[in-house]
Regions:
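Conserved Nudix-box catalytic region and its N-terminal flanking loop in Nudix hydrolases
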Residues: 2-3, 29-39, 50-95
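Short helix-to-loop capping/linker segments positioned immediately adjacent to catalytic or ligand/cofactor-binding
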Residues: 18, 92-96, 113-118
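A structural signal for short, well-ordered beta-strand segments
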Residues: 42, 70-71, 127-129
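Short, charged/polar surface micro-motifs in flexible loops or helix N-caps
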Residues: 45-51, 58-61, 111, 135-136
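Nudix hydrolase/Nudix homology domain
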Residues: 65, 77, 109-185
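A short coil-to-beta-strand element that immediately follows conserved catalytic motifs
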Residues: 96-107
Length: 185
């Protein structure tokens, strides 16, 4: 299900030179021939170190029902990934922009391309962040079907034991030592 925000939201396309090359409506950018565009991923932790995993809503057009990192999104034109992270935390998880602390960039150069079972492609330059949330979350059911807080070591074990249950971008992100170490810290 699309929301009014997703109908008007723009994603920033990336040209062959690796620089911004225009925009495209988010509602129609993801197809079988998705252009390369900017995004971000974020892993949220609580002060006790537990990591939030979310299961994508079943109505999502790509990877419905798949478990993944805490949240993802697309910076809009002129928006920094950090500002987009705070915006999406509110839209997706009901976290006030001030409710996130210590947002830090873990994988600045992460990118991936993946095709879901319906043939829709994700092709993103997608820096990966971690941030701390101290308060409660109130996930938007149009975005998140289920969620679970887990110790970082349990997250890594679950992905290793059942990789098919998790999003391809999360699996690829966890191939990076810097992220694995951050989740275990």
């Amino acid at each position: 299900m699309r929301t009014p925000a997703s109908d008007t939201e723009l994603v920033v396309l990336i040209g062959p030179d690796g620089r911004p090359a225009g925009t495209h409506p988010k509602a129609t950018v993801h197809t079988t021939n998705t252009p390369l565009h900017y995004a971000f991923s974020c892993y949220l932790t609580r002060p006790d170190g537990q990591v939030l995993l979310t299961r994508r809503a079943l109505a999502k057009p790509t990877w419905p029902g798949v478990w993944t990192n805490s949240m993802c999104g697309h910076p809009g034109p002129g928006e920094t990934p950090e500002a987009a992270l705070r915006r999406r935390a509110s839209q997706e998880l009901g976290i006030s922009p001030a409710g996130l602390d210590d947002a830090r960039l873990i994988l600045p150069d992460f990118s991936y391309r993946a095709t879901d079972s319906s043939g829709i492609v994700e092709w993103e330059v997608c820096p990966v962040f971690m941030a701390v949330v101290a308060g409660e979350i109130a996930p938007n059911p149009e975005e998140v079907d289920s969620w679970q807080w887990l110790p970082g070591a349990d997250v890594l074990r679950a992905v290793e034991a059942t990789p098919f249950v998790f999003s391809p971008w999360m699996r690829e992100q966890l191939d990076h030592t810097a992220l694995r170490k951050a989740l275990l810290a």
